[in-house]
Amino acid sequence: MRWGHHLPRASWGSGFRRALQRPDDRIPFLIHWSWPLQGERPFGPPRAFIRHHGSSVDSAPPPGRHGRLFPSASATEAIQRHRRNLAEWFSRLPREERQFGPTFALDTVHVDPVIRESTPDELLRPPAELALEHQPPQAGLPPLALSQLFNPDACGRRVQTVVLYGTVGTGKSTLVRKMVLDWCYGRLPAFELLIPFSCEDLSSLGPAPASLCQLVAQRYTPLKEVLPLMAAAGSHLLFVLHGLEHLNLDFRLAGTGLCSDPEEPQEPAAIIVNLLRKYMLPQASILVTTRPSAIGRIPSKYVGRYGEICGFSDTNLQKLYFQLRLNQPYCGYAVGGSGVSATPAQRDHLVQMLSRNLEGHHQIAAACFLPSYCWLVCATLHFLHAPTPAGQTLTSIYTSFLRLNFSGETLDSTDPSNLSLMAYAARTMGKLAYEGVSSRKTYFSEEDVCGCLEAGIRTEEEFQLLHIFRRDALRFFLAPCVEPGRAGTFVFTVPAMQEYLAALYIVLGLRKTTLQKVGKEVAELVGRVGEDVSLVLGIMAKLLPLRALPLLFNLIKVVPRVFGRMVGKSREAVAQAMVLEMFREEDYYNDDVLDQMGASILGVEGPRRHPDEPPEDEVFELFPMFMGGLLSAHNRAVLAQLGCPIKNLDALENAQAIKKKLGKLGRQVLPPSELLDHLFFHYEFQNQRFSAEVLSSLRQLNLAGVRMTPVKCTVVAAVLGSGRHALDEVNLASCQLDPAGLRTLLPVFLRARKLGLQLNSLGPEACKDLRDLLLHDQCQITTLRLSNNPLTAAGVAVLMEGLAGNTSVTHLSLLHTGLGDEGLELLAAQLDRNRQLQELNVAYNGAGDTAALALARAAREHPSLELLHLYFNELSSEGRQVLRDLGGAAEGGARVVVSLTEGTAVSEYWSVILSEVQRNLNSWDRARVQRHLELLLRDLEDSRGATLNPWRKAQLLRVEGEVRALLEQLGSSGS
């Protein structure tokens, strides 16, 4: 997986649009603002505000208050109510934004966008070539602050109309929301009254006539009594017209007549035209935002200043954004209060790793040039490293990201087809993405891109749509490759976006072979005329003795079935390719897909296996995950809002084809990372019935060595927690589990018969969760392995509370858990509280003779205990002999294993002991292990010297050889 930039957008509410983005510029600095309105706030409680500017250019502190233009108390109160309503309205954040915590709001902290002034000559130049279209804005153009937009121009003329333009995702909606909130909180003192309009809202009114006063009064009720005074406000009245591309404006007098009366009913587009002509309210200030393709809808003579909304022009601004985002106090807290909040140290670590990757990985820096991709990076990191809200998937993050940027957007409002911008992107960019996945490449030449964009274009209207897409949205999806040796090529802005769009291209049914296209047309034609022809042929067959007619009659019926089977075969082929990609074993990228995604964002700590030889074969393991995720009901509903509906029947048939292939390949034993990818696919699909059927044959869950982050624990618990059949074994050894992960995985543990939690650094705190697990009435665990965890005596005291009330556990391993004498004495005192235990392993716990002997005696008296492991403890020669004698003293009672020998014979448990040593050789203290092995070797030599039985001597010699080999291995690895 590899790496690109923008900030998202959502609706303002009923008819308005809003976004969540914060662009900026080069040298950020902080300004702490105070309230300018007569020394007091316009409304609301005190609120700290920090502004991070995108440029070093800033205006002076707000000047003193102008003379009041609305002198009456009632008018002042009406405007104050208007401020309060706007602030409440524009402060609302979409659900996707709220997951970052309530403190990240536009009225408390903000990174100002970079706005670079441009000229009409630049806008009228011919469109740049594809390669140049993706270049950042020229550094020489002066940046503008929000407060400077209406400053006099270079000739000293007053600027009344400002047009701000930017491609999809540069943050036009967020800029408008921020500007409105600035005015609400008194930070734009130059304007007495601000009236925002959404052009999308106005376009939805159609040709129904309404006056400007009616439009304002309908949307902002408190302003009814201020409307007669609007003309007197002059330049202190600011209209904000957001999303001009949604309106069809005609500035010809023949098309739109002149009108200066704000109370005269007209079409909404005519009102906007006369406002921009300065024929209606000629002194009012107007701010317009639009996509680049619609700039020409306003003649340049009516515009005082053009400004391009740009992205984060250097990595310092990107770092600032990430610090603000990821260091929010509630950033790591799960929705609904579940899970554990990320600590400040963990958040700082994420920011530091991301900063290092931004400095060393130029492609991700190029991606984050667009602020909305910075949002996507933060959302992905939040998903990967924080407790995940129920139902949130990686696919839903990407789908929501596209909804925030494309919701309600049509490609061209003047085109009668009203084609969705996202639907056009799915058809063109999806084709390019899928061709890249199928040919296993992520770099595309200009010919590749043009080939997908221009495929099938035949009419002038289609070329016009392509031109609009290239100007408004192409660089949202594609970025120039900045890697050495890749000049002139393009990559998808974010690597995962290629796989998402490829999956979308498939599930939307846009990939069709020539045979399928022809077959579909033939089948539809036959279907339309088939009934009539069949009726005629049926009559003729009865009247005329023609034997060929029944055959022809049946052939007509067969044609739709043949086409249906052809489509079904195509779906099966896609499912086959998807499943093969999911279970494809890689030599280089063998981490699970979530770790791969995290590494692509944060970088890889430490050297790669082959630093000078990157893999030639690209990995597209997210592609099948996104395919499953896009078929989920939630994502299909969001895609329908974007103009990309997936039919229920198509989703069902695709799911059935995938299930058929998964049922065959899913039965094989998978490596831990591949098994997690399999479970992650089911998590993305969000269909419990589907997952239960496919995973019904899963009996062993082996995720040993997989780093179980909060999201991975959530994935495993969500997919396997609701299953009914028992799991023979759950192996989570060396998974970096913590108590929060144990709590998340509780539903899975309740299905397990054998549970392995070795090498997880679980301490006494985790024993509380293990106690609750053992006391659960559905617990069916028979074997519990907790070796190589620092449980200590305090943890075992808690664990014994669970064992006292548990009736299922028969085998318990506490090998190398730091129990010491205190822990073994505690076990000896409370062992009789459990009546089912059959085997107890407390080897390598640093216990002495007294504690070990006490536990051995308690074990001998236990009604069910059969085996007690005490080897590798700090036992003297006399202590070992006493324990050996105790273990074989009488019939019945537990056998005590303290050495590789039993008298003059080899212990039948010698292989168990040595295999434990071999398995933990790299994690145990080498000097201590070497000392214990030397003691065991001495026991073997003594036993061999004390026996005359040649068979026993041979066995002892064999075991001696195994011990010596381990000692040599210790010595060589130590050196």
From Swiss-Prot:
Keyword hit for Membrane: yes
Keywords in alphabetical order: ATP-binding, Host-virus interaction, Immunity, Innate immunity, Leucine-rich repeat, Membrane, Mitochondrion, Mitochondrion outer membrane, Nucleotide-binding, Repeat, Transit peptide
Region listing for Required for interaction with MAVS, in residue ranges: 75-556
Required for the repression of MAVS-induced interferon signaling: annotated span: 556-974
InterPro entries assigned to the protein according to its UniProt record, in alphabetical order: Leu-rich_rpt, LRR_dom_sf, NACHT_NTPase, NLR, NLRX1_C, P-loop_NTPase
GO terms classed as biological process: innate immune response; negative regulation of canonical NF-kappaB signal transduction; negative regulation of inflammatory response; negative regulation of innate immune response; negative regulation of interferon-beta production; negative regulation of interleukin-6 production; negative regulation of macrophage cytokine production; negative regulation of RIG-I signaling pathway
Domain NACHT: 160-483
Pfam families in alphabetical order: LRR_6, NACHT, NLRX1_C
LRR repeat boundaries on the chain: 695-718, 724-747, 749-777, 778-801, 811-834, 835-857, 858-877, 878-899
Residue stretch of the organelle transit peptide: 1-86
Domain LRRNT: 667-694
Family per similarity comment: Belongs to the NLRP family.
Complex formation: Homohexamer. Interacts with MAVS. Interacts with TUFM. (Microbial infection) Interacts with influenza A virus protein PB1-F2.
Protein name (Swiss-Prot/TrEMBL): NLR family member X1
Organism field: Homo sapiens (Human)
